[in-house]
């Protein structure tokens, strides 16, 4: 009887652990500007978030991006309105702020997080076109 209880407890524990793993991102994927370009080109409804300031975003940004600044106090409140079950792509100027944003998104339960390596500067150096 003790063994049966122990086995049942292990099965229940494994069930809850496996469910937890499916609800949050396993890792944040650092991807190249070319990979972001391909994703944006193939899906104009992509959750693409520029985490720079409003002023930086106003100077230039990727065509379909929305601006949610990671240093604003309401960052979590704003990103909470996005779909946690859909892939989300983030970028900033050089990659530091988007890395921080990606970590926050992971903590909030986003399942598929992509961080553009090198940020907007890297995008520009690659001569990619999907800019505003």
Segments and roles (model prediction):
Residues 48-50:
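Structural scaffold elements adjacent to functional motifs in cytosolic proteins
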Residues 2-9, 16-39, 45-46, 55-87, ...:
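Rhodanese-like catalytic fold shared by cysteine-dependent sulfurtransferases
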């Amino acid at each position: 009887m003790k063994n049966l209880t122990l086995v049942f407890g292990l099965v229940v524990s494994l069930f809850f652990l496996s469910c937890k793993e499916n609800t949050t991102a396993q890792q944040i994927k650092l991807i190249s500007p070319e990979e972001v370009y391909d994703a944006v080109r193939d899906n104009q409804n992509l959750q693409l978030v520029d985490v720079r300031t409003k002023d930086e975003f106003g100077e230039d940004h990727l065509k379909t991006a929305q601006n949610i600044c990671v240093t604003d106090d309401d960052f979590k409140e704003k990103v909470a309105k996005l779909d946690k079950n859909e892939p989300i792509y983030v970028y900033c100027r050089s990659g530091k702020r988007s890395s921080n944003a990606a970590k926050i998104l992971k903590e909030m339960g986003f399942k598929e997080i992509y961080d553009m390596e090198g940020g907007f500067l890297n995008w520009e150096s690659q001569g990619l076109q999907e800019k505003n």
